[in-house]
Structure formats: C-alpha cells, structure tokens
C-alpha cells in the first residue's frame, strides 16, 4: 500500500511540475509542490518551489501571505535567518499584523545583531 501511495505522489509531482509551467497555474502548482517536499523533509526543493510560487501572482491575498509565511519559516528551519528575516519584512510591509510576523521580525533581528 505504501509504495502505491508513493507512486501516486510521484505522479502528482510530475503533473504539478507540468502545471507550474503555465503562468495561470504557477502559484497553486508551485505552492503545492513546496508543501509536498516539506512533508517529504526535502527542504531544499521545498524552498525552491515556494520561491517560484512567491514570484507568481497569488489568487488571493491570504494565499500569498500564507505562502510567504511558510517560506520564511522553512528558511529559518535550515539556518537561513537573514533570508527568513527578509521574507518576514516583506510580508509585514504588505500586510501588517499578519499572524506573529512582527514578533518573528523582532526575534530574527536580534539573532542577526548578535551575528
């Protein structure tokens, strides 16, 4: 059963990669790919796809904010504090008061200041 499930996910990945080539489907397909790779603990690929999604127009402001938040927390999880901070700052400038972004910025700024 497990190998069958993995095969289905691999098929979905191939279909989503093809869909991500279409400008109209890029955000949704790339963000789904990012989340699949996060579940697989493949953070390098997850970040690559989340960044591609972030470059595409989000279908809704909430979807765009959620994607940027996921990207920032994933970057931080691999020690990329400066990049995570930059994404959080972008998110805060676009939509102040989203989740705990202000606190994340304050915390990461202190980490950066300590070097």
Please state what every model-predicted region is.
Residues 32, 69-70, 104:
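"A position-specific structural signal for the A-helix of alpha-solenoid helical repeats
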Residues 28, 62-66, 100:
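Start-of-helix register in tetratricopeptide repeats
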